[in-house]
Structure formats: structure tokens, C-alpha cells
Amino acid sequence: MSNSFHLAIPAGNLKKAEDFYTKILGCKTGNREDGKWVDIDFWGNELTLHQTEMKLPRERHDVDMGNVPVPHFGVHLKKEIFNQI
């Protein structure tokens, strides 16, 4: 991973979360501690998914792009790359 940004998030079911990032989005995995956490190469940034049991409260805020969940994160992609996914 070449960028300096790192984000660690609760993932719930780690296997399902890893499958989403790798099989759907096409991200690669990095370091891991089986059953506890896995690093995802999120377009050059390190995203660490942590196995969790606790549910986070659902909260939404109205912003310029509509009613969005908080917290949230994403990646800005060129349209061509987005369409490939």
C-alpha cells in the first residue's frame, strides 16, 4: 500500500466483509490475524476490518448529496474505474 491513509473499522462478520471487499470490489488483502482482523488494500490506502459482535447505532445526516449514514467512508474513483467494478 503506497498511500499514508489508514482506517480501522468494525466489520461485523469478518469473512463476509472480506468477501465483499475482495470478491465484489476487487481489493487485495494484506496482513491479518485470522478471526480478528484483516488489512485491505483500498486503492492504495490501508483499511483494517475488525471482527465485531456489537451493532453500531444507525444515524443519518442530511448533507449536500442527500441523507447519508454516519459514519461512512468511500473512495473517489474515475468513472471508467467505477464502471469496471
Report the location of each language-model feature.
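Vicinal oxygen chelate
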Residues: 1-4, 28-79, 85
